[in-house]
């Protein structure tokens, strides 16, 4: 019996020690450290995306024009001299692919994309590209994620942080 009591006392002792009696301590995070950490992670993601874009351009032998925002474009076939202006309505045929080459959307399945330039209804990179294009141009655009759907994707087929590759033909401008 004595051995049983010692064993029982031993079990209760360790059970008591295993109970958490400490008060929850609040972890204070330095806002500057958090900001620096987020900036570092963002720089890494931007550099990684930039490397992927450069690799894509080199693999496909594209001679692209790069804008200050990160948009890249090449006109594959020159159309008319009629440059697209802000406020005009543009109709275009398109194929939209991921940087890995997977088809996401196309005008064959979705219909032509029609939008007002500068209206904010399409990806900002696509909107920006219109300033460099003419009626009947055929072009390839590389739109980095920050000029496309960014952090959230399109909640359908485009995942977060996706670089988009558009091949477009400007059908009409009004």
Predicted regions and their residues:
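Cross-family detector of peptidyl-prolyl cis-trans isomerase
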Residues: 2-6, 19-174
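Short, Lys/Arg-rich N-terminal segment immediately upstream of the first membrane anchor
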Residues: 1-2, 11
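Bacterial N-terminal signal peptides
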Residues: 7-16
């Amino acid at each position: 019996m004595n051995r049983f009591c010692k064993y029982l006392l031993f079990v209760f002792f360790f059970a008591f020690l295993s109970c958490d009696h400490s008060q929850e301590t609040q972890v204070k995070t330095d806002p500057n450290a958090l900001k620096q950490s987020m900036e570092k992670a963002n720089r890494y993601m931007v550099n990684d995306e930039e490397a992927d874009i450069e690799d894509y351009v080199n693999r496909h032998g594209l001679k692209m024009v790069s804008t200050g925002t990160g948009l890249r474009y090449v006109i594959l076939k020159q159309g008319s001299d009629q440059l697209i202006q802000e406020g005009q309505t543009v109709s275009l045929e398109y194929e939209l692919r991921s940087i890995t080459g997977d088809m996401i959307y196309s005008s064959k399945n979705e219909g032509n994309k029609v939008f007002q330039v500068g209206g904010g209804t399409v990806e900002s990179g696509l909107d920006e590209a219109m300033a460099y294009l003419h009626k009947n141009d055929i072009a390839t655009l590389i739109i980095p994620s920050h000029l496309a759907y960014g952090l959230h994707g399109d909640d359908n087929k485009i995942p977060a942080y996706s670089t988009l590759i558009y091949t477009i033909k400007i059908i009409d401008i009004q």
